[in-house]
Each structure stands twice: as C-alpha cells, then as structure tokens.
C-alpha cells in the first residue's frame, strides 16, 4: 500500500522539525505589543489596543507542479489565498489584506497574467486588499515557480474564538470541500503519474480529467463563516488541511472529537485510494475527504449553521460530536480524534 511518506511527505517528521525550530525562539518585545496565547493554533496574533492583529502565511505546495504540467496557472493563486484566509477565520478574525511572494526560475507575460487573474479572483472572494508583494527571479535556486502569501486579519480581543469552550455534547458541522484543495498533492501525483502512468489530460473513471480535479481551487470559507460567527454562538473552527481531522486537536485538547456521520466521500478520493491501494487511515490522515472546514456549536445552533452554509451554496452536515472520552477496544481514550468509516474506527494521531 502506498503512503504519503512514500510520496516524500512525512507529516510526523514535519511536526518534529517545527518543534525543533520553535524551541530556539524565545525573544519577545518588552512593551505593550504582546502576542496572543495561541501557540499551536491556526494563526498568530499580537495585541493592538482593543484588537488582535492576526497573521497567517502559506503557499500552494506541489499543486504548482500540476499547474506547470497543465500550463494552467489561474487557479493556484486562489489556493494560496484560501490557505491563508481559511486559517485566519479559525480564530474568528476577519481577513483584510494580503502580500504575496513569487519566486521564479523564469516566467512569461502570459503566466504572469494568469496568476494576476487568479489573485484578483481570490481577493474578491475573500473581500481583502492586495497591498504589495515581491517577485524574485532565482534561476540558480529553484525550478519552476513557487507562490506564497501572508494575510493580515483583525479581531476584537473580546471576540476571539480559541476553541477552549468546546465541550461534551457540542456537535461538529462539516462544510463541503470543493475537492482535493491544497493538501495531499504529492500523494495524488504519485498515484496518478507514477503508479497509474496517467497524465493531466487523462480521464478518470467518472469522466473528469486529472487536471480538472487536481486544479479545482480550494474553497474560500470567509464569507459564510464570518456570517455564522455573527448569527450563532460558534465555539470552535477548524480548517481541514494537511493531517485531515487531526487539525481538530488545535482547539480544546482536553476533549475528544468523534466523527461518525460523514457524507458520501467525493469520487476524487475514491479514485486515489483505488488506483494507489491506499489504506483508509492514510487517506483520512492525508486528505480532507470531502470536508474542508468544521464549525463546532451546541446542538441547538447546528441547524442555523447548516442553513447559513446552504445560503452560500456550500452543503453542510452534522458529522460528529464532542465527547469527554472515547472507548476503543475496551480502552477509554482522551484528547483524541476518532473517525468511523466503513465500519472501522480510526484514531487520528
């Protein structure tokens, strides 16, 4: 069975590397501009009067490789923006501005125009301003193009959502993803291009091409989620990216997240699993599996969240609930994420 590690990505090694890096950083300013206590969360923030200024930074990863193969660069800027703004809203912040960074081996005017078009689409959907950026020509350092960005967001101190109020009995509402989004592309490319010998124009079993699926842009959840925050008591928010539902552990770490009511898994994930002979556990630890964002609320607020999501034409479902502990094979586990699928119970560690 092929794994994400076989494709060159070890999420556990990445965690260790991040911890090693952070362990050497201990400086803080001594004035009133202090960081918020959000270590390990989706975004970083600093105090600014009655507000927090929130920063997120991210790129598109190896999705850019597929864009280069297909000679289609219009959607990847949307992915870059989505990866940033979807993280920012996880603490209740409203994204307001973006700066981008593009490193290139070489670039044509046509590709630049495609990227510009995608940037415009992404900032429009996120309702943010692109206020600057940097383009670096680095022919001796990189191959192809890399695109990343940093988003600024704001939230009142009194309105920050950390997930710490999530408790037993609350429910998890899952919002549909648009597809593969921007995570697991290394494994998808290995399955399609190496194991199955397909190309970007090859048709999958359900009619779409590989490029159609892999270049569908990441859904931007800014508008519906900010609307939900205004109209319901939202307790926790999670952007489901690399690591899948493990991301829920960024919220309240003292509870268990039980996901046992998933909707139909989209065909792109079934295709990857079938062609690559990928285990269920590996799929759920690598991909979003059809749920791109989670909203945690009390049971009485769940229908309101689903209603708002549907208003934005995003299907939403109650996919699970919060427990104090979960029983697995006669043993009670705490502080974990459990996914039940195909009659199997999987711990997302």
Curated annotation (Swiss-Prot):
CDD domains: PurM. It comes from the Archaea. It is found in: Cytoplasm. One of its GO terms (biological process) is adenine biosynthetic process. Coiled coil: none annotated. Its EC number is 6.3.3.1. InterPro entries: PurM-like_C_dom, PurM-like_C_sf, PurM-like_N, PurM-like_N_sf, PurM_cligase. It is an enzyme of class 6 (ligase). Pfam families: AIRS, AIRS_C. GO terms for cellular component: cytosol. Keywords: ATP-binding, Cytoplasm, Ligase, Nucleotide-binding, Purine biosynthesis. Pathway: Purine metabolism; IMP biosynthesis via de novo pathway; 5-amino-1-(5-phospho-D-ribosyl)imidazole from N(2)-formyl-N(1)-(5-phospho-D-ribosyl)glycinamide: step 2/2. GO terms for molecular function: ATP binding; phosphoribosylamine-glycine ligase activity; phosphoribosylformylglycinamidine cyclo-ligase activity. It catalyses: 2-formamido-N(1)-(5-O-phospho-beta-D-ribosyl)acetamidine + ATP = 5-amino-1-(5-phospho-beta-D-ribosyl)imidazole + ADP + phosphate + H(+). HAMAP family: AIRS (MF_00741). Belongs to the AIR synthase family. This is Phosphoribosylformylglycinamidine cyclo-ligase. It comes from Methanococcus vannielii (strain ATCC 35089 / DSM 1224 / JCM 13029 / OCM 148 / SB).
